[in-house]
Amino acid sequence: MAKSIRLIKSLTRLLLPVVVLLVVAVAGASIWLVHETAHPVSAAYLVTPEVYGMLSARGAQVTDEKWVNKDGTSARGWLLRGSQDAPAVILLHKYGANRSYVLNLGVKLNEATNFTVLMPDQRGHGQNPSVDYTSFGGCEADDTTAAIEFLRNLKTPEQFSLVGKDIGIYGLEMGSLAAIAAATKDPSVKALALDSVPQNADSMIASTVESRYPFGSVVTSEFAKLGTRPYFYQGCYRRESSCDMAKTLAGRSVLLMAGLDAPQFQDSTSKLSKCFPSNSMLEAKTDLSPSGYSIINASLELSESYDQRVIDFFRLALGQPAI
């Protein structure tokens, strides 16, 4: 009996340091993966309003605006003013992109509808962002509600409110999570065009890790999910599923889009169509080729077709005729 106890103690002394080392290594790797993916590689603007304005009179009217987020951080975006009392639409880009990726859509949407259009850089994105990290749709949802408040405070030259009562949001990938979450907080968000919607923030970060670190992608993505708990323990990382959030959005107009170019989000977007309440006005097109996820690399014809689908949706859903 004494020999058995001594043997157990010896094994414990031998294995305990190994176990501790493994736990520390896993924790360190998990937090490192989250830290790296939460700081996106900076992407230069594809085009700026100054350059775009040389080709488009409407594009020349884009202004660079700043406002304050709910947490006191600074936000920025390009703004195209529409007609007085017309709806406004916010365009939210995907992870790793920036506001220039939605500039062309924003200008065409404004031209076709005379809606006010806001194209923000989501936190951690764009050139020299004031907040250098992303929370994969969590803080970004609060930022979107701050953007809505910014729109509400816009005035005409005569000091009347510029934007009408209804708001629409276009969200791509990470932007779609922010859009859904913001809509749950603000009933004035009447229309949502959502493309390549992740199941939740965990699946968003898993996809990002697999893309940036494809070696052992299944293992690294699981490590990253573990790392979100200590890394964002005081942050606004949200773990609710897009389906659970969608269940609260009664009476909204929704356009769901996805495609084969982003299969990791095609299935989750298709399943999301079953989550909205029965009184939602829902349209789903999940077999696009390509979806908005890679539309930036598509031909001019395909790009125009995609943009027109989004424009037609908002024009019908928000009910404001072009002026």
Which role fits each region the language model picked out?
Residues W67, A75-W78, K225-A322:
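Serine-hydrolase catalytic core
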Residues A181-G235, D267:
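Hydrolase active-site cap/lid region
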Residues T134-E158:
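Alpha/beta-hydrolase active-site loop
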Residues N110-P129:
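Conserved alpha/beta-hydrolase
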Residues Q159-E173:
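Alpha/beta-hydrolase fold nucleophile elbow
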Residues A86-K94:
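Short beta-strand element of the alpha/beta-hydrolase
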Residues S10-W67:
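An N-terminal hydrophobic leader/cap segment in hydrolases
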Residues Y95-K108, S268:
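The serine-hydrolase catalytic nucleophile loop
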